Amino acid sequence: MALRSSRAQAIGELAQQAHAGGVDRRSFLLRAVALGVSLSTGDAIFRTYSARAFQDESGSPITVTVGGTPIAAMEPDLTNATPGGTLRFGRSTDSDNLDPVTNDGNVNIWYFMSIYDQLVRVAPDGITLEPALAESWEISDDGKTYTFHLREGVTFSDGTPFTADDVIYSWTRAANDPDEHWTFTLTALQRDENGQVKGITAPDANTVVVELAQPWSPFLSDVAMFNMSIISKAFAEGNEETLVESAMGTGPFSLQEWKRGETLTLVKNPNYWEEGLPLLDSVVVSVVPDDNARILQIQGGELDAMMDVPSSRVPELQMDPNLKVYQFPSTLTAYIVLNNRNAPLNDVHARKALQYATDRQTLIDVVLFGVGVPATSFMPQGALFWNDKLTPYAFDIDKAKAEMAQSATPNGFPLELKIRGGSPDEETLATALKDMWSQIGVDVTITPTEGTTLQDDYDNQNFQAMTSYWTNDIIDPDELVAYAILPESSQAFQTGWVNEEAQKLAKDGTAEPDSAKRDEMYRRIQEIYNEESPMLSLFYKPYLDITTTKVHNFGHPPTGQFDWRTTWIEQ
């Protein structure tokens, strides 16, 4: 994470003054412009962060309390842990599908991963694997046979025993389901003449053998992917369509109730296989679309924890003695997804014009208040095979105009930019981009959209441009590369961009056993992606979460899925 620049610090202090009512609009704008912020962006910041924006229903501004301490991520400390209690957690957008196989977004994944387990899971450090439902495994010398030895005595949350049959059912369903969104994890499985998966067998109830059609370097990492979650065969077989809103897994929590648009309630799995865990009795996940409303609720005692903290509020919230502010290391890459299927964004010169017209450091300063790093790749900084030789597109209006002049729309074009409604950060981001891009003739219309609708628009390619982000769910780049480049490997592929060299490298990279050669392949993929610019990678940022001081061991690993196994709350 980069240290905050002096400009970012100055902008942050100015926003805090606006929040406290210590500066009027005119003075704010004059000082913002002096810091290099445009009038319209400065106005957006003022409107978003002025004292009026933070008034409660009575009209009283929130009081900023001095004396709080920011808390960094740490190893779980269970010394004084008190079991029991309910964690009330706030988020901006509801889930829309709890099926590990057919879902397609973090609004689902980050929550149902508390319900389901995989044979192997990503460790809390986000960079290594560890045993889960499989205690151990062997890989044949030719890299085509994997033998998993299952943990004995495990049951699903309803008490049904977990066996190898559940693994075969879950993986076969994932491989054969026509609505599977994440087929890249299953590419190497053997298929019969009808395209149905084969080669997954169970010599006994506690052993699973997988015979691959070809060597597949990321297979063990792929086994930790959410779509490889183990579902109870007894619960789901013949009723798969109900898994959109029901669940039966071996994870630390089970699904008690889902009120669409309101709450998702998870309760402790009494049969969970990790002794003594989870500590909480339940987690109630509430949908509160407006970021500032969630802050009001946590300060008012209605919530215990929340995600998506506006960056500008962090300095203020760190001073609140009743709150803990977390900046968790993440794999989050924020970007603008561009629909490459249609004009004008099917033109690489138009896309590169937007790249050069985007001042990433200014975005970090005015949106994240310095808490972030300019993105150089669609892959997260420091990830396996991340290309550290790439540099961000320099902000250069002359180059942007030159690229636009070579495009089919030399005078620019109108562009609708969809953002998540209720997000101060996204409103400021969009306003800043509108200012920047206007210099090359791009007339941006900003369309705030409710979170679930925004996800639907993304899934159905109903957009020109849209703010978004992604995170690594596994430690191998196989996931993001498939997501970004291979339309047949993931229904989450949304840009419509096609490049034969990149696609060949993506496919060859999974079969290559030599890590050094894979590194070369994935570095080249990133170079091509950077040159073709099917989307605009903006910045890398940490997860910003807050809890009350009564919450302990709040977990948000780099891969994003919340880990509440060891979380506890003072009663």
What is the predicted role of each segment?
Residues 33-48, 107, 259, 268, ...:
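Detector for C-terminal structural segments
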Residues 123-125, 216, 221-278, 282, ...:
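Gly/Pro-rich hinge or "lid" segments in bacterial periplasmic/extracellular proteins
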Residues 135-182, 209, 297, 344-346:
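Aromatic- and charge-enriched surface segment that lines or borders ligand/interaction sites
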